Regions:
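Structural alpha/beta core scaffold segments of enzyme domains
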Residues: 1-187
Length: 187
């Protein structure tokens, strides 16, 4: 026997690999048809309903269809990874960035999925597009009992980029320098 899945999956082969572990089946026993409907933007990066449908179908021995209305979809789908972070940024009087220190913590929810990769990618890009001769970055992905988090548009960059861009605005204000000039000088 085997199982056949139709789902709006972004990576059907990864889904097959994960479902084979969940169901203790050979990957050859699982066929996944990915619907090419709509944009991804992270919502189809992790498996959502596939494990629930697969287990139900396998146990019941018949076809199962899971459908979420709009409200259920918002409740069930992954949420953006919340970051808590502290930044220290040094610049000289002319606006040259000298150092950037980041300590970041990401609430990746109760179990692994793509959320740890999302957090790691955000931390890896904590300096944005700017040149800092000295950097110190520390990040920890923390498992909690909060909502399941995952991939969203920006893939972890938005959270720390918001902090960095806000930091640069504060530096420009303190130096009485144009915000765009500060950024252009440090690309």
């Amino acid at each position: 026997g085997g199982i056949e899945i139709w789902a709006p999956a972004q990576y059907p082969y990864r889904d097959i690999a994960q479902l084979s572990k969940i169901l203790a089946l050979s990957p050859a026993q699982i066929h996944c048809h990915a619907h090419p409907i709509g944009g991804g933007f992270g919502g189809k990066d992790d498996m959502a309903l596939q494990p629930l449908a697969a287990v139900a179908a396998w146990k019941l021995g018949k076809s199962v269809r899971l459908y979420l209305n709009r409200e259920e979809s918002f409740l069930y789908s992954t949420k953006r990874v919340p970051f808590t972070f502290h930044m220290k940024t040094a610049a000289d009087r002319e606006g040259h960035l000298l150092a950037h220190q980041v300590e970041a913590y990401g609430d990746v929810g109760p179990y692994t999925g793509i959320s740890v990769a999302v957090f790691n990618y955000g931390v890896e890009n904590a300096c944005g597009a700017y040149y800092f001769p000295n950097i110190s970055i520390h990040g920890e992905a923390i498992f909690t009992n909060n909502a399941h988090t995952g991939s969203f548009r920006g893939f972890g960059n938005n959270q720390l980029n918001w902090g960095l861009e806000t930091q640069l605005d504060l530096i420009a204000e303190q130096l009485q320098m144009d915000r765009l000039t500060l950024r252009e000088e440090n690309l």
